[in-house]
Amino acid sequence: MKIKIAVFPGSFDPLTLGHISIIEAGLKLFDKIIVAIGSNEQKKNMFPLSEREKMIQLNFKDNKKISIKSYKGLTVDFCERENAKHIIRGIRNSNDFNYEQSIAFMNYRLNDKIQTCFLPSTQEYAFISSSIVKEILLNKDTIDKLQLKKKLKPFLSRDVLNQII
């Protein structure tokens, strides 16, 4: 039987509870998920690639169905190299859907053998955004450590919190 491989691409800067929730939902649908950390020259990342890889490893260290890889270039080309037929995208709201749908259409035009699967965020995590986390972290010098952890706790796993604070 052929295994179903999916790619969950993103910058994961940092990895949030929202990302973790989408990965866990994807594990119910696919035999293997490649968490693919994309390199986007237009984005300035707060955390270096090695730290983002470590965040993912810490959260999924015991799960053999998950692998972590970094890549450059088009996501559909990466999927083809990895024999993945599916791209997972998390959807928090209609704005996410409209944006992700246009990307999915483009990807389909580039490679019609790769399907994008939209996984809705749970209500619990629909408000989470890496941008909000980065905004809090940019102001960390004005917040004591205990308060900083308290502010970030709704967004990040314990492993990620301990790594970045």
Question: What is each of the regions a protein language model found here?
Answer:
Residues 1-165:
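Nucleotidyltransferase catalytic core that binds NTPs
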